[in-house]
Amino acid sequence: MHRRTFLATGAATALGGPALAQTDRQRTLRFVPYADLSIFDPIWTTADITRDHGYLIYDTLYGTDAELQPQPQLAEGHLWEQGGRICTVTLRDGTTFHDGEPIRARDCVASLRRWMAVAPMGQTIEALLDELTALDDRRLRFRLKRSFPL
């Protein structure tokens, strides 16, 4: 091994080690957006910065993984019934808002209705719905006008 290769390898190894002396404060992620955030509500704008902020702050029932497959986030899971016309989504237990209040199915229904009233994709989904209701604190039901292939 050449001297320069040996020194470069040693330096790279030393630099790649963990920062053992970090405090909790140093582990805080600081996010610097590329633009000023003027609208906090992702429903009322199509600005990328607002969308990015929304994904960092708000949760969704489902998200997508690295292979773009749907994965439960706020949802624990779902059950399809009546040949794909009814989907019952169960929320994860113990989820809360920032103030400690539990997230209930009726909160999700209200958020979805608000989204469906404004967003073009929401309006498309609303056109497919016969009914959207909260069955109890942890379950909400989507009743579709016809079976929907997923």
Residue positions per predicted region:
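Short, well-ordered beta-strand elements
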Residues: Q26-A35, I86-T88
